[in-house]
From Swiss-Prot:
The keyword Transferase does not apply. It comes from Carboxydothermus hydrogenoformans (strain ATCC BAA-161 / DSM 6008 / Z-2901). The gene is rplJ. GO terms for molecular function: large ribosomal subunit rRNA binding; structural constituent of ribosome. Part of the ribosomal stalk of the 50S ribosomal subunit. The N-terminus interacts with L11 and the large rRNA to form the base of the stalk. The C-terminus forms an elongated spine to which L12 dimers bind in a sequential fashion forming a multimeric L10(L12)X complex. This is Large ribosomal subunit protein uL10. Keywords: Ribonucleoprotein, Ribosomal protein, RNA-binding, rRNA-binding. One of its GO terms (cellular component) is large ribosomal subunit. The keyword RNA-binding applies. Belongs to the universal ribosomal protein uL10 family. HAMAP family: Ribosomal_uL10 (MF_00362).
Length: 176
């Protein structure tokens, strides 16, 4: 009996580590998906730096309680798979929602972001976000725009100053 308890404790620790080491986690109901469809989903998630693992509800509940995640118990019913985004939560969520459009048997249950349980519509909002690198580019562009404007204003003032000096030089040359 003891080896089984140790084995379950090991699985709980694996689930905890998956959640802790990820940017976000999403619980899905995969009931009705074929092995080929699950393999396709795994491949698509892997391309986006995410992975998916089928978990036992009781062990997932235990892992959630150990991590201090509350409000997850009602969603841990029926077949459950845990998808974790190691890099970009938006990309992983987008893959899941796109896959669910083509495969209605896949149902997104709930998400976990920084140990906070997110409803399906909140996870959908994350999926609708642009990828991380696009957001960073927009942020950087927004930060650089005022600097370019300031540099342009300084260059314009310097240009006017040079033109004024040139006009004074021509005026003095004309007086002599």
């Amino acid at each position: 009996m003891k080896p089984i308890i140790e084995q379950k404790a090991k699985v709980v620790a694996e689930i905890e580590e998956m959640i802790k080491s990820s940017q976000a986690a999403i619980l899905v109901d995969y009931r009705g998906l074929t092995v080929a469809e699950m393999t396709e989903l795994r491949r698509k998630l892997k391309e986006k730096g995410a992975e998916i693992k089928v978990v036992k509800n009781t062990l997932a509940k235990r892992a959630a309680h150990n991590l201090g995640i509350t409000g997850l118990d009602p969603y841990l019913e029926g077949p459950t798979a845990l998808a974790v985004a190691k890099e970009d939560p938006a990309s992983a969520a987008k893959v899941l929602f796109d896959f669910a459009k083509d495969h209605p048997n896949l149902e997104i249950k709930v998400g976990i972001l920084e140990n906070i349980v997110l409803e399906k519509d909140q996870v959908k909002a994350i999926a609708d976000l642009p990828p991380r690198n696009v957001l960073l580019a927009k942020l950087l562009g927004g930060m650089q725009a005022p600097l370019y404007g300031f540099a342009g204003a300084l260059a314009g003032m310097l240009r006017k100053f040079v033109y004024a000096l040139e006009a004074i030089r021509k005026q003095k040359a004309g007086e002599e």
